[in-house]
């Protein structure tokens, strides 16, 4: 049975597996961005691995939206980043407040995002009353994915997990707002674009990877990291071309729009 109003299309890989891999890669990416930044590799490695959190989040959106959220697909993506923003900021600032090593920030972000996601998930079930059996788990997963995507891309940009640097170069200059929108689109867009009677897990995941790469490209441009700009746009083009070919193959018909007439007939 296909997506788009209920039911589940066949999964290539279990949701838990994709989520675990995506979050693990983004967690490692936060640390590598911190340590490799002095060598000019923070955005190249950190940005690449941060995109994995976007894929994990997009896959969870696909899972929960299959229960019939309808126009709620973009909304739940924004909720993911709303929860993630709180968790990412808390994860960076809590170590400073309690005099803990700042390198524990990604771990604290994971913990805080899981707690926030669980609480929001419980509230959506009661008192809001959304009768989706996987809602609590999905909101927890989305909160974690949103937080790790935000933290991953912003740390890759800042080049450090040190609280004051993060405040100056991720919060005070508005980079967190860019991360909110860019990562949010990367998480909500894949299933929103692919849902329908013939949705396939492979095609949705392919677009999710492309969205992760284009988010990485955006941050590379803002940071003016030439190597990351070139690598990210090449990887995006490769994956996106693959997605377009898959879409043509799966479509029942492909209708090309004719050239607009130069003058009225």
Swiss-Prot record:
Family, similarity comment: Belongs to the MtrC family.
GO cellular component: plasma membrane
Keywords: Cell membrane, Membrane, Methanogenesis, Methyltransferase, One-carbon metabolism, Transferase, Translocase, Transmembrane, Transmembrane helix
GO MF annotation list: tetrahydromethanopterin S-methyltransferase activity
Annotated EC: 7.2.1.4
Reaction catalysis annotation: 5-methyl-5,6,7,8-tetrahydromethanopterin + coenzyme M + 2 Na(+)(in) = 5,6,7,8-tetrahydromethanopterin + methyl-coenzyme M + 2 Na(+)(out)
Complex formation: The complex is composed of 8 subunits; MtrA, MtrB, MtrC, MtrD, MtrE, MtrF, MtrG and MtrH.
Transmembrane annotation, as ranges: 18-38, 41-61, 75-95, 100-120, 141-161, 175-195, 202-222, 224-244
Organism in which the protein naturally occurs: Methanocaldococcus jannaschii (strain ATCC 43067 / DSM 2661 / JAL-1 / JCM 10045 / NBRC 100440) (Methanococcus jannaschii)
Presence of the UniProt keyword Translocase in the record: yes
Role played: Part of a complex that catalyzes the formation of methyl-coenzyme M and tetrahydromethanopterin from coenzyme M and methyl-tetrahydromethanopterin. This is an energy-conserving, sodium-ion translocating step.
Pathway named in the protein's UniProt entry: One-carbon metabolism; methanogenesis from CO(2); methyl-coenzyme M from 5,10-methylene-5,6,7,8-tetrahydromethanopterin: step 2/2
Pfam families attached to this UniProt entry: MtrC (PF04211)
Main location: membrane
Stated name of the protein: Tetrahydromethanopterin S-methyltransferase subunit C
GO BP terms, alphabetized: methanogenesis, from carbon dioxide; methylation; one-carbon metabolic process
Topological type in the membrane: Multi-pass membrane protein
Subcellular location: Cell membrane
């Amino acid at each position: 049975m296909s997506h788009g109003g209920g039911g589940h299309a066949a999964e290539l890989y279990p949701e838990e597996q994709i989520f675990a891999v995506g979050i693990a890669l983004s967690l490692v990416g936060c640390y590598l961005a911190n340590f490799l930044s002095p060598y000019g590799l923070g955005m190249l490695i950190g940005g690449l691995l941060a995109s994995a959190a976007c894929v994990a989040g997009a896959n969870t959106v696909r899972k929960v939206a299959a229960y019939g959220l309808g126009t709620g697909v973009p909304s739940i993506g924004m909720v993911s980043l709303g929860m993630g923003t709180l968790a990412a900021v808390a994860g960076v600032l809590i170590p400073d407040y309690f005099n803990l090593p700042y390198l524990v920030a990604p771990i604290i972000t994971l913990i805080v995002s899981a707690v926030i996601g669980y609480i929001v998930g419980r509230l959506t079930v009661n008192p809001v009353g959304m009768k989706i059996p996987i809602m609590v788990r999905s909101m927890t997963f989305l909160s974690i994915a949103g937080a790790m995507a935000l933290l991953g891309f912003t740390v890759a940009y800042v080049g450090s997990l040190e609280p004051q640097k993060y405040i100056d170069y991720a919060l005070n200059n508005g980079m967190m707002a860019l991360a909110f929108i860019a990562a949010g689109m990367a998480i909500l867009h894949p299933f929103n674009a692919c849902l329908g009677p013939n949705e396939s897990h492979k095609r949705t995941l392919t677009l999710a990877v492309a969205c992760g790469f284009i988010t990485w490209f955006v941050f590379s441009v803002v940071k003016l990291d030439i190597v990351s700009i070139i690598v990210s746009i090449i990887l995006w083009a490769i994956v996106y071309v693959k997605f377009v070919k898959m879409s043509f193959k799966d479509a029942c018909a492909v209708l090309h729009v004719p050239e607009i007439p130069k003058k009225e007939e």
